[in-house]
Regions:
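Transmembrane beta-barrel strands of outer-membrane/channel proteins
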Residues: 1-4, 58-64, 119-123, 132, ...
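Signature of Gram-negative outer-membrane beta-barrel scaffolds
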Residues: 1-114, 128, 132-135, 146-148, ...
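Residues that define the transmembrane beta-barrel architecture of outer-membrane proteins
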Residues: 37-41, 97-101, 162-166, 231-233, ...
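Residues on the lipid-exposed face of transmembrane beta-strands in outer-membrane beta-barrel proteins
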Residues: 43-49, 105-109, 168-172, 237-241, ...
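Outer-membrane beta-barrel channels and translocator barrels
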Residues: 51-54, 110-114, 163, 175-177, ...
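Membrane-embedded beta-barrel scaffold of Gram-negative outer-membrane proteins
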Residues: 116-118, 122, 128, 132, ...
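Gram-negative outer-membrane beta-barrel transporters
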Residues: 185-188, 205-328
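C-terminal beta-signal and adjacent terminal beta-strands/loops
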Residues: 308-350, 364-369, 376-471
Length: 471
């Protein structure tokens, strides 16, 4: 009976997070590792009121979210059997359905014959990302067993993430052919997911009466919960013209200030491993996804129907220039931790990462893109066909979108140039190791893409061709 014993042993060793499939890609069913069916039920009603020059749009949306997840009966004592490496069913129940009411209000009225004032208020809600609550029972063993540092745990019965947004602005038409719009905005988001450690998970609950039996979850195990927030403030300026002599132009600029405690759910993982900082400090800081400056300029040159002869009729050319400032990052240092020599000393493990400056003080370089689109409308019988060619990043600009946190640039990860990190490895493995490291990791970023799931540079020049049919 060796085959089943081997496959069972391999499954326990893998301890992955498959939901709905086993290790071999076969579909499975069951209460714990079977497929989940999250759902959203929505209702929306809107009414528009007009009186003289005043326009009011008011509405309300109601969402009911069902994550199809599990809920712990006692979060201070998770029902986990470490000996059998399985869930104790009586200690869990179905997660609650969450209902969120979201009012919306928009208003516009003129203050002169060329100026219109507008404002908007709205509440919005969405489910958390589904990879945060969903985990197989074997992955729970990895998290709750306490044998490993696992910075990607799971959450139970998570609440929706709610956003309140405010906008106020005005539109001004300063000529018959041109107008601009200015809008200031504020966005407050609460209930974002954050990594945490349940300080109440302790055998002491047996003696103080908060639980009748202490189960097998490690008292230092991490989990996800709702508890983070962010605030985004800014303004947007847009300029547009009517089409004059076949040419229409549009330009926009947005300034944004994004601040919060954590840039993503795992930002505080390093603090939770340090007993002196058991609770992450609630410091407000720039968020890593902030682009302080963002803008675009577009020119669209287009022939009308019957204009320019058969070849040029309904032909259009659109040229767009886009730019944005970089995003915040933190220059850091630290040892290799548990990394192997082929992947260098990337600072992906928060336990080995030591900030060398205030969080989010540095910024990646600015990005610049030029895109070109050419399209032509054709009439084929009763059908309208539009064929197009689109070139993204026309000049093939190599924009830096991420950097190594040790060096602050995208071409040197700071490993080979730091003798304290690499001298012993280079001495043992020789020049061939250096050559392979420079070509595989630095030139082709293999270690970075494998660790972080993204690249250091933007997408190179891309060609797209297509057609759409209207009937």
């Amino acid at each position: 009976g060796g085959n089943k014993e081997i496959t069972d042993a391999l499954s326990l060793y893998n301890r992955n997070g498959n939901i709905g499939f086993n290790d071999y890609g076969d579909e499975i069913d069951g209460p714990w590792d079977g497929p989940r069916t999250p759902s959203t039920t929505s209702f929306y009603v809107n009414d528009k009121y007009e009186s003289d020059d005043l326009v009011i749009n008011a509405g309300i949306r109601v969402d009911q979210f069902n994550l199809d997840d599990w809920k712990m009966k006692n979060t201070a004592n998770p029902g986990w059997d470490e000996t059998g490496q399985t869930i104790l069913p009586d200690e869990f129940s179905d997660s609650d359905k969450k209902t969120v009411i979201q009012p919306r209000l928009g208003m516009a009225f003129p203050v002169s014959d060329r100026t219109v004032f507008h404002l908007q208020y709205g509440k919005y809600a969405q489910m958390p990302e589904l990879d945060l609550p969903y985990a197989s029972s074997r992955y729970m063993h990895l998290v709750w067993g306490g044998q490993n540092y696992t910075p990607d745990p799971m959450g139970f019965d998570l609440d929706p993430i709610e956003t309140t947004q405010y906008e106020i602005g005005l539109s001004y038409q300063f000529s018959a052919a041109a107008a601009f719009d200015f809008t200031a905005f504020a966005k407050n988001t609460i209930g974002q997911i954050v990594i945490s450690k349940n300080e109440d998970t302790d055998p002491a609950c047996v003696s103080n009466g908060t639980c009748t039996q202490y189960y097998g979850a490690d008292e230092d195990a991490l989990y996800y919960e709702n508890g983070d927030f962010s605030t985004i403030n800014g303004f947007e300026f847009a300029f547009r013209t009517r089409r004059i002599n076949r040419l229409q132009t549009y330009a926009s600029y947005t300034w944004t200030d994004a601040r919060g405690v954590n840039s993503d759910a795992n930002s505080g993982a390093g603090n939770l491993t340090q007993e002196a900082l058991a609770a992450p400090p609630a410091m407000i800081m720039p968020l890593y996804y902030e682009n302080k400056h963002r803008g675009s300029i577009a020119m669209d040159y287009r022939f009308g129907d019957g204009d320019g002869g058969l070849l040029l009729s309904n032909l259009g050319v659109n040229l767009q220039y886009k730019f944005n400032s970089g995003h915040p990052f933190t220059l850091s240092d630290g040892g290799m931790g548990q990394r192997s020599s082929d992947s260098g000393a990337l600072l992906d493990d928060a336990r080995a990462r030591e900030p060398q400056e205030p969080i989010g003080q540095s910024t990646t370089p600015w990005n610049h893109f030029i895109n070109l689109k050419v399209d032509k409308k054709l009439s084929i019988g009763d059908y309208g066909v539009t064929v197009f060619a689109y070139v993204e990043n026309l000049l093939n600009t190599k924009n830096v979108i991420n950097v190594y946190s040790r060096s602050g640039n995208a071409y040197n990860d700071g490993f080979l140039t730091d003798p304290a990190l690499s001298s012993e490895i280079v001495a043992a493995q020789g020049d061939l190791y250096v050559d392979l490291y420079e070509n595989v990791n630095l030139a082709n970023r293999q270690h970075y893409t494998l660790d972080f799931g993204q690249d250091l540079y933007s997408t190179p020049r891309t060609y797209k061709f297509g057609a759409s049919i209207n009937f």
